[in-house]
Each structure stands twice: as structure tokens, then as C-alpha cells.
Design a protein with these regions (language model features):
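Ordered alpha/beta subdomains of enzyme catalytic regions
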Residues: 8, 19-239
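Low-acidity, Ser/Thr- and Arg-rich intrinsically disordered low-complexity segments
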Residues: 2-3, 7-9, 13-17
């Protein structure tokens, strides 16, 4: 059976290429597609950057204040639990545009008529605004700001997508975990969601958010190692 498995070839497709990976010979170059401090600068929607280009070209870089909040609570939900702030702050403190990603952006057709000064600006970019936020684990309600950012228009626009993604997801998971914990009525609730998560990184963030929401442990070993959450597990059903 093992020799049969070793002959299996995995095929991945992208818009520009087809890579055949021979699992036995270890050829090809599969990409892990994980976020890191280098590539998170372009972990955003393109329209955020086209708006930044518009602001820059027109000199629209005055100080502005943006608030992240939930307009309406989901049906049969009376509250949410704020989560994701630590990762949002890490992003703001470490956000930089490296030469590799600036070249990629500069070569995009949508930026062909943009002045080169914009990319000089982005090369020196760092977040210099002010952030006000409720602590993680705080009960929040509709129309109540989770995070308030005061910064230049360009800075605030660049960070919108990442902050929304990070805060929305972890707040969603922490809120659900809190409801389950309350329903358990004093019995311990454990996060076993990694295998059902939308990818390994989502599983890691979910384990963190579950702990904020009141879970007593996680099956995710990486989350336990990185965050100090008690690791819990026995054996699978197949045992």
C-alpha cells in the first residue's frame, strides 16, 4: 500500500502555470500560502490600494477617524465577544512594504499611470495613527465601536481589510464559544474545531478565540504551545 501511495502525483493549478509534484522524488514547489510579516502588506483588497493611489494623487491625506462596529446582531444573539485585537496590533506595528511587493504592485496595469512618488511613500510607510479598542473578551453590542482608528486617510485605508478580517473572524468564534460555554452550565467546553476549520491558520485563530470565549482547552497543539492553552485529547473514533 505504501508503494502505491508513493506513486501518487498531486497536481495543482494556478492562473499561470500547472505544477506536477512527484511525491516520491519530491520535485516541484508547492506553496504553503501562510501569512507572515513580509507578505501581510498585500493581504488586502486591491480597491484599498487603488483608493490610496487616488488619495495620494489628489493630496487627500488629512487626519480621519474610522470605527469598526457591528450594525446589527445576528438573529437570536444578544451580545458578541470582542476578539482579535492582539493580532490586529501586531499587524499595525509590523506593517511594511518590501521591495518585492512594491515591484509587484508597480507592475500591475491598474497602477500604470500612478506617479512613482506613491511607491516611494509606501517604501517608507509605517502606521503612525492612534488606536482605541475594547479589551479582548469584552461583551459588545450593536453599533458599539470595537476599534477606533485615528490616522491619515491613506494609513486608515490601507489597514481596513486586514483589521476587518482579523477582528470579524475571531469575534465570531469567541461569541459562539461563549454561548456554548453558557449553555454547558459549568461543565468544561473544549475546542476540537481545527479539523473543521477553514485551513490551519483559521484553526489556530479559532482555538485562541474559543479560549477567550470561555473554553477550557484545545485539541490544537500549536495553539496550546504558542498561547499556553491547555492541550486536551484522547484518541480518535478509529482507535
Amino acid at each position: 500500500a505504501s508503494s502505491v501511495m508513493m506513486r501518487i502525483k498531486a497536481v495543482t493549478r494556478s492562473l499561470h502555470s500547472k505544477i506536477t509534484i512527484d511525491m516520491k522524488k519530491n520535485t516541484g514547489k508547492p506553496e504553503p500560502l501562510f501569512l507572515n510579516d513580509a507578505n501581510m502588506c498585500i493581504s488586502t483588497d486591491l480597491y484599498q490600494l487603488t483608493m490610496v493611489a487616488g488619495y495620494f494623487e489628489r493630496g487627500m491625506d488629512h487626519k480621519s477617524t474610522f470605527e469598526l462596529f457591528v450594525r446589527n446582531l445576528p438573529e437570536r444573539r444578544s451580545y458578541l465577544i470582542a476578539a482579535g485585537l492582539e493580532q490586529a496590533i501586531h499587524y499595525l506595528k509590523n506593517l511594511r512594504f518590501t521591495a518585492e511587493y512594491l515591484k509587484y504592485l508597480k507592475d500591475l496595469p491598474v497602477f500604470k499611470n500612478v506617479s512613482r512618488e506613491l511607491f516611494d511613500y509606501l517604501r517608507e510607510f509605517y502606521f503612525s495613527g492612534d488606536v482605541y479598542a475594547v479589551p479582548e473578551g469584552t461583551v459588545i453590542f450593536a453599533n458599539e465601536p470595537i476599534i477606533r482608528v485615528t490616522a491619515s486617510m491613506i494609513e486608515a485605508q490601507i489597514i481596513e481589510t486586514y483589521l476587518l478580517s482579523m477582528i470579524n473572524y475571531q469575534t465570531l468564534i469567541a461569541s459562539k464559544a461563549s454561548r456554548v460555554v453558557h449553555a454547558a452550565d459549568g461543565r468544561g467546553v473544549i475546542d476540537f474545531g481545527t479539523r473543521r476549520a477553514h485551513g490551519p491558520h483559521a484553526g489556530l485563530l479559532a482555538a485562541r478565540a474559543c479560549f477567550i470565549g470561555g473554553c477550557v482547552g484545545t485539541s490544537n497543539v500549536l495553539a496550546a504551545y504558542e498561547l499556553g492553552i491547555p492541550p486536551i485529547g484522547t484518541v480518535a473514533h478509529s482507535w
